[in-house]
């Protein structure tokens, strides 16, 4: 059974989202995603300043088994990427919820309403 922290929101595509005190959103991939992918060997993340729409493929995670797109959970602007994660992508395998990938500033009118809670995500992956 995968770890699904209750304080985060999730997407059907296996990203987790944490709302920060300043209103930005921190995004990573879930424990289920890293477990399914296996040993992660490469991360391609979006450029800071890039405008993205909810559901856009914004990056790639590659493992020894497969490559999978990383999707933007909401519409907004990329305001930061985790360069430590790109330098040491295997860290995601060890701590999927501690190693974030990128941060977003919500676009005007965008919301997190379509994200799912931990209970719904747990049902999705069971």
Swiss-Prot record:
Positions of the Lipoyl-binding domain: 24-105
Name of the gene: gcvH
Entries under PANTHER family matching the protein: GLYCINE CLEAVAGE SYSTEM H PROTEIN, GLYCINE CLEAVAGE SYSTEM H PROTEIN-RELATED
Cofactor: (R)-lipoate
Pfam families documented for this protein: GCV_H
Chain positions found as N6-lipoyllysine: 65
Species annotation: Burkholderia vietnamiensis (strain G4 / LMG 22486) (Burkholderia cepacia (strain R1808))
GO biological processes: glycine decarboxylation via glycine cleavage system
Keywords per UniProt: Lipoyl
Family: Belongs to the GcvH family.
ATP-binding is among the record's keywords: no
Cited NCBIfam families: gcvH (TIGR00527), PRK01202.1 (NF002270)
Gene3D superfamilies, sorted: 2.40.50.100
Protein name: Glycine cleavage system H protein
Quaternary structure note: The glycine cleavage system is composed of four proteins: P, T, L and H.
Cofactor, free-text remark: Binds 1 lipoyl cofactor covalently.
Function: The glycine cleavage system catalyzes the degradation of glycine. The H protein shuttles the methylamine group of glycine from the P protein to the T protein.
Cellular component aspect of the GO annotation: cytosol; glycine cleavage complex
Domain of life: Bacteria
Signal peptide bounds: none
């Amino acid at each position: 059974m995968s770890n699904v922290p209750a304080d985060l929101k999730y997407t059907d595509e296996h990203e987790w989202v944490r709302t920060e005190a300043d209103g930005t959103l921190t995004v990573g991939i879930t424990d289920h995603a890293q477990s399914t992918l296996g040993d992660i060997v490469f991360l391609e993340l979006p450029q800071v300043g890039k405008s993205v729409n909810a559901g856009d493929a914004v990056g790639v995670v590659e493992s020894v088994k497969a490559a999978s797109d990383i999707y933007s959970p909401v519409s907004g602007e990329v305001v930061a990427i985790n360069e430590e994660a790109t330098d040491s992508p295997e860290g995601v395998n060890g701590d999927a919820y501690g190693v974030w990938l990128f941060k977003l500033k919500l676009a005007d009118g965008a919301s997190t309403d379509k994200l799912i809670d931990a209970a719904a995500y747990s049902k999705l992956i069971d």
